[in-house]
Amino acid sequence: MEAKTIDRIGDSWLSQQPIYLADLDRCTPADALATEPRLRCWRTLTYEIDSLSGTMLLAGPETAAATITYPLNLRGLHAVSVGVLPITSSEEGHQLAILLKRSGDETFTALTLPPQSDGGPHHHELVEMFWRITDLTGHGLQIGQNGARVAPGDNAGSFECAPARVAYFKLIPLTDAETRAFQSDQQSSDTRRLFAHNDAHGPHYQYRLTTPEHVRREIEPYRDTDFSRMYWEAGGGDQTSYFSRVGGRNTFDLGDFGRRGDRMHVESWREFEQRGIDPFDIALEHTHEIGLQFHASYRVAGFHYPPPLDHFNTGSSFYKRHPEWRGVDRTGRQTPRMAYTFPEVRQFVISLLREMAQRPIDGICLLYNRRMPLVEYESPVVEGFKREFGDDPHGLNAHDPRWLSYRAGVLTEFMREVRAAMDQEGRAQGRNQRIEISAIVGGTERENLINGMDLATWVGEGLVDTLIPYTSGPNYDSGVTAWTDPKQLEHFVNLVRGTSCVLAPNLMPRHMTPEEFRHRAATVYSAGADHMFFWDCAGGSGRANYRDMWNALRRLGHRDEIDAWRASGEPNLSASRMDLRKLGDWDLSYVTPG
């Protein structure tokens, strides 16, 4: 008889009674707790729900509360969840968060608190967030506040923090059988089908990272999940997110930024540079440490940015130095893009990719999903077409198949050059495995050809190892729910069939319900693809946020669990929510608190 599939999402599959720890005023050191709001301290506040009463901890947007420890005396594996008081006002946005780790561990994970349900303006509830299954032998649990210094001194306004509200810990011990099942699941490689993307900008923008531990937080959520690759952005155009000898740094000499977060981003990079710490290397090392591959990703069209967020264009740049290599549109006007029609542009980009490959990365990824096209009506490609076909492409329909096919030869040549360069770097380093090449592309055959990409040739010649269609929506629309019909992937499945090329469709939009993520994954699997990609996993506004969606998302490589869930009637996957009855001395059972 075939064994029944167990759906191991969160802690719902465990059999033991949970242990609730609601007396958070036991945390140490005691002088980091206060009964009234105080800088650098956690405020204690009593509360009641139907099944529990206790003392929660709160910290505000300027508190910069100290790290505290809840002491434990437990052994073995436990599922750890945390009860939180969620977002209650639009001003808090997605910034409400807590930091959590075991005592003795080096790196926190950031849990982004969810919004409260729509229960009216005076409705208050606690929400449970599943963290992970971990061995608590010899460990307590540590809570921190996510924040950044934004001004000198040690006063109100010196720090900007994510408000935090922690009510309880829930621990469920694993039985011997459950421990064996969990460990067997962790050792399995056939479910590790998921690939994550981090733009290496959002975390600096949001939190002004300044230490290696801050960078490692962006990697830590993928530990013990179905993810096998991290696609970490290394640059775009001539700007790099690593210490480069070829490109520029993210340390623009600018006094007025279009967004406050961009100033935080630059200040973060300046501090890392002054300390000689390369965030790229930290991310690479920690990714490998937790067992994932690391693929350096590059925005091929990132040479020049549109206003009003054009502060990225400040100072000397490849774009400004070489107007002769810019794009040209159908009317003969210069466009604000570097054209890959010119070999000099391609070789500059390849020099950056070579530099990235001199680090112990597993692959590079070319991001063709922003600010296309890279080839238009530049003189070399126009004259070449005239010689071959005897026609001027300016007089043809813009989508004439001969013109589109011929023009796509430019990026095919670029991909050949990239393949040759990566193979050469691999041989020079004595690598046993090829430096892999991934490409994020458009969602249809026509869209890709219009943007100069002949994917059939790329796959047929072995120029790309992983193909990532960005979305099934037109014009790279990130807001469209992608891949609602298996037929939308048919073209890509046929392209890679019988080849070594991996197909990993990107699931969009970024945020969906846990049920919707399972539906989209089921569609991808039914279409014949075995892997999935997730653009923008970074930070609290990304996907690795520990909300309900992350519980489902991090196990989407378990196709059997998705199938079993659908066969059982698709039960709700959301976490428990419990109405607060009392908060401090306020009775919340009144229509308005009183």
Task: Name the predicted role of every residue range.
Residues 1-71, 593:
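Glycan-recognition and processing domains
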Residues 72-96, 594:
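A short beta-strand element within beta-rich, extracytoplasmic domains
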Residues 103-138:
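Extracellular carbohydrate recognition and processing domains
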Residues 132-154:
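Noncatalytic modules at the cell exterior or secretory-pathway interfaces
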Residues 186-212, 254-285, 289, 294-358, ...:
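Active-site-adjacent "subsite" loops/lids of carbohydrate-active enzymes
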Residues 213-244, 359-363, 463-469, 524-532:
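Catalytic domains of carbohydrate-active enzymes, especially glycoside hydrolases
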Residues 238-279, 307-340, 372-409, 559, ...:
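Aromatic- and acidic-residue-enriched carbohydrate-binding clefts of CAZyme catalytic domains
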Residues 344, 348-500, 512, 516:
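Active-site neighborhood of glycoside hydrolase catalytic domains
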